């Protein structure tokens, strides 16, 4: 996925959730 702000942990968290599932 792509997060506009790579320091946005909430964005990254959901990104990784999407990758895991």
From Swiss-Prot:
Disulfide bonds join 1-15, 3-11. Belongs to the endothelin/sarafotoxin family. GO terms for cellular component: extracellular region. It comes from the Eukaryota. This is Sarafotoxin-D. GO terms for molecular function: toxin activity. One of its GO terms (biological process) is vasoconstriction.
